[in-house]
UniProtKB/Swiss-Prot annotation:
This is Autotaxin. Residues 854-875 are annotated as: Required for secretion. It comes from the Eukaryota. Residues 28-35 form a propeptide. Its main location: secreted. The gene is Enpp2.
């Protein structure tokens, strides 16, 4: 089982136990475990048993699906976890006599109930044959030797209401292991080549087992379901959760609704999802096959198999060790036993199988360890969750001297070869979704791949020899390629011989619900984004309804009404050009504008614009106008080079969209337009920013959402300096934003044959990953009502086929998105004192994001007008550009 830097050859933990009011549980058991140098848990091994009672018998009860409560003894697959098995459980339920396979000499044997499985003539009717019985004794072929076949409809025996689902989960299966192919893993390779597969599946952060297994089960991020690590402390409970502690059995730690509970609540039977480690893999497979043979009214519809390998070997030998071949062969052999067993039951064209991992594995050793004692003088005053990531809290909750910001400062950019980066949790990249939970410590260390972090050397080298007992680990940033894992779907409901783009594991819960005909519980996935995996779709997503329609300004205010402290119009030469520039701002119109709200038609100090209505070209809104999904008031402002949705509440655009061709030129800003800001005569002075606020607030400056550098003409450049294109920016952040607009946008347009860019502000002061309400915004430009964003976003869309220009694309789209933290310093980049070309693009890659993340943080909905199907658009929205090399 996954653990923080596990060492040595010891029995691993299989899975946590969690009992809920319905009679299904998920379970972890601990054999007596050797204390490991990198183990997060307490040094003493606690008893995991709420009660112990061995009276009674397992005769006729082996692996019963109903969990028996205390004080009776148990015979289910998790009784070992609770030390509550009946006294004869091992004798009756864990038989191993004569092994797990038929041989020629066993065919037609006299039934012996002591055998692990049977090769007798009656074994098929009794459902307890060895999985290779038909092959050895009846001359049939192994499943793996049969040709791929397209299963267009489920071929199930009578009585099966729906195709059963078997989830075959493997711990620590790095995606690149699949490159070993059929020579090492012929059965898994056949599942991949004949079914649906992705190059990899992205785990959630942290890339540890507990968080990811429970994410697979619930579709929730760790910050949402509460299992934020393999170990954690809850300050409200004043309790700690560890692999071997009794707390893991307490339901209060586990949030959300896992799949087996969803199934039970909707009348669908679920088999066990987790297994005690003492139960051999072969017995687990045989038990699942026996459950599939139960009468219709007893047979579950969903099952799960869990393997502790190849994680255990990956930790011990590293992902590249030659010793990894045998564990992978053993996993493949188990897959073959399952598929042969299904074929033997005539269920191989009926059952859907998902082969899935929880995370990958990286090459890590003790020699690559950063010690906080080299940075801090008080490491004995802190508690560090160590290893491939670091979580820091005060050792004593009463330590009044503990100051997270001081610790962050003492850990930031102190060495040129530093291998970790400290963050306050709210400043972590938004794509990690790792802040909004009290169990996540305030200080977080993102550790470089292949490295560890510890408090001091004594925490690692506890033995006099100082020998390192591990060669691999996981837990790193979930976009790192070595952390990616495997996904394969095979069966009648999955597509045949289909490769799909990578996706995140939060999406699988919805797919599994679709396979079982269930309505998913609320989760972080985007239902419908993986419809392309399935042959037929039971769920068809629909576009959300727009909540707030925009205003279309139909008048303009007189120049004399504005006293915003802006210094630009007096620089316009000749003077009569000012009125001409303002006339450029008239509403260009469209069918939407004709039927929309035109604000204000009467005012003694206002004059109507040219009344003609021109057909609006979609040059800058290639995929339709973003919809606002909450109640507010905003205006659509048209310009030659860009369009904006201007918020009357925030006094800045919610979004600004523009399209840049491959041939676009970057122009300089004339000296007389430096520090230029113009009033926008279409927007009331009361709904405009006041430039004087920036003169009063010495800590704040401003920038523009549409870059003046990319204006198409000298006249259009004046549009870019409108106050309605202005947003508050810290001077340090302006360096990032200016380089992005001046250099990177042009670079992306050149590389991709043109791009559409949508940018805007984000407000997430409570760091819950959702749009803040007005009441939740905490910071304003001094002396004003101008709110200060916590982040800025940018969505860059082009044609996937770069031979097609962005504005003429008739095929799939490509997207790169960013959520850039808006902070008063650039300390995240240790070389920020250098030229922006040395660090800004790397900073942006760190803060890459999904469009879906941006939608949650802004309350906007993008890509609403396109010829692509909505499911295809959802797939685009959930895509993350990782900037990693190929797996």
């Amino acid at each position: 089982m996954a653990r923080q830097g596990c060492l040595g050859s010891f029995q691993v933990i299989s899975l946590f136990t969690f009992a809920i009011s319905v009679n299904i549980c998920l379970g972890f058991t601990a054999s007596r475990i050797k204390r490991a140098e990198w183990d997060e848990g307490p040094p003493t091994v606690l008893s995991d048993s709420p009660w112990t009672n061995t009276s009674g018998s397992c005769k006729g009860r082996c692996f019963e699906l109903q969990e028996v409560g205390p004080p009776d003894c148990r015979c289910d697959n998790l009784c070992k976890s609770y030390s509550s098995c009946c006294h004869d459980f091992d004798e009756l339920c864990l038989k191993t006599a004569r092994g797990w396979e038929c041989t020629k000499d066993r065919c037609g044997e006299v039934r012996n109930e002591e055998n692990a499985c049977h090769c007798s003539e009656d074994c098929l009717s009794r459902g307890d044959c060895c999985t290779n019985y038909q092959v050895v004794c009846k001359g049939e072929s192994h499943w793996v030797d049969d040709d791929c076949e397209e299963i267009k409809v489920p071929e199930c025996p009578a009585g099966f209401v729906r195709p059963p689902l078997i989830i075959f989960s493997v711990d620590g299966f790095r995606a690149s292991y699949m490159k070993k192919g059929s020579k090492v893993m012929p059965n898994i390779e056949k599942l991949r080549s004949c079914g649906t597969h992705a190059p990899y599946m992205r785990p959630v952060y942290p890339t540890k087992t507990f968080p990811n297994l429970y994410t697979l089960a619930t579709g929730l991020y760790p910050e949402s379901h509460g299992i934020v690590g393999n170990s954690m402390y809850d300050p409200v409970f004043d309790a700690s959760f560890h692999l071997r502690g009794r707390e893991k059995f307490n339901h209060r730690w586990w949030g959300g609704q896992p799949l087996w509970i969803t199934a039970t609540k909707q009348g669908v039977r679920a088999g066990t999802f987790f297994w005690s480690v003492s139960i051999p893999h072969e017995r687990r497979i045989l038990t699942i096959l026996q459950w599939l043979s139960l009468p219709d009214n007893e047979r579950p519809s969903v099952y799960a198999f869990y393997s502790e390998q190849p994680d255990f070997s990956g930790h011990k030998y590293g992902p590249f060790g030659p010793e990894m071949t045998n564990p992978l062969r053993e996993i493949d052999k188990t897959v073959g036993q399952l598929m042969d067993g299904l074929k033997q039951l005539r269920l191989h064209r009926c059952v859907n199988v998902i082969f899935v991992g929880d995370h990958g594995m990286e090459d890590v050793t003790c020699d690559r360890t950063e010690f906080l004692s080299n940075y801090l003088t008080n490491v004995d005053d802190i508690t560090l969750v160590p290893g491939t990531l670091g979580r820091i809290r005060a050792k004593s909750i009463n330590n009044s001297k503990y100051d997270p910001k001081t610790i962050i400062a003492n850990l930031t950019c102190k060495k040129p070869d530093q291998h970790f980066k400290p963050y306050m949790k709210q400043h972590l990249p938004k794509r990690l979704h790792y802040a909004n939970n009290r169990r996540i410590e305030d200080i977080h260390l993102l550790v470089d791949r292949r490295w560890h972090v510890a408090r001091k050397p004594l925490d690692v080298y506890k033995k006099p020899s100082g020998k390192c007992f591990f060669q691999g680990d996981h837990g790193f940033d979930n976009k790192v390629n070595s952390m990616q894992t495997v996904f394969v779907g095979y069966g009648p409901t999955f597509k045949y011989r289909t490769k799909v783009p990578p996706f995140e594991n939060i999406e699988l819960y919805n797919v599994m619900c679709d396979l079982l005909g269930l309505k998913p519980a609320p989760n972080n996935g985007t239902h419908g984004s993986l419809n392309h995996l399935l042959r037929t779709n039971t769920f068809r997503p629909t576009m959300p309804d727009e909540v707030s329609r925009p205003n279309y300004p139909g008048i303009m205010y007189l120049q004399s009404e504005f006293d915003l402290g802006c210094t630009c119009d007096d620089k316009v030469e000749p003077k009569n050009k000012l009125e001409e520039l303002n006339k450029r701002l008239h509403t260009k119109g469209s069918t939407e504008a004709e039927t929309g709200k035109f604000r204000g038609s009467k005012h003694e100090n206002k004059k109507n614009l040219n009344g003609s209505v021109e057909p609006r070209k979609e040059r800058h809104l290639l995929y339709g106008r973003p919809a606002v999904l909450y109640r507010t008031s905003y205006d659509i402002l048209y310009h030659t080079d860009f369009e904006s949705g201007y918020s009357e509440i925030f006094l800045m655009p919610l979004w600004t969209s523009y399209t840049i061709s491959k041939q676009a030129e970057v122009s300089s800003i004339p000296e007389h337009l430096t520090n230029c800001v113009r009033p926008d005569v279409r927007v009331s002075p009361g709904f405009s920013q006041n430039c004087l606020a920036y003169k009063n607030d010495k800590q704040m400056s401003y920038g523009f959402l549409f870059p003046p550098y990319l204006s198409s003409s000298p006249e259009a450049k004046y549009d870019a300096f409108l106050v309605t294109n202005m947003v508050p920016m810290y001077p340090a952040f302006k360096r990032v934003w200016a380089y992005f607009q001046r250099v990177l946008v042009k670079k992306y347009a050149s590389e991709r044959n043109g791009v559409n860019v949508i940018s805007g502000p984000i407000f997430d002061y409570n760091y819950d990953g959702l749009r803040d309400t007005e009441d939740e915004i905490k910071q304003y430009v001094e002396g004003s009502s101008i709110p200060v964003p916590t982040h800025y976003y940018s969505i860059i869309t082009s044609c996937l086929d770069f031979t097609q220009p962005a504005d003429k694309c008739d095929g799939p789209l490509s997207v790169s998105s960013f959520i850039l933290p808006h902070r008063p310093d650039n300390d995240e980049s240790c070389n920020s004192s250098e030229d922006e070309s040395k660090w800004v693009e790397e900073l942006m890659k760190m803060h890459t994001a999904r469009v879906r993340d941006i939608e949650h943080l802004t309350g906007l909905d993008f890509y609403r007008k396109t010829s692509r199907s909505y499911s295809e658009i959802l797939t685009l929205k959930t895509y993350l550009h990782t900037y990693e090399s190929e797996i």
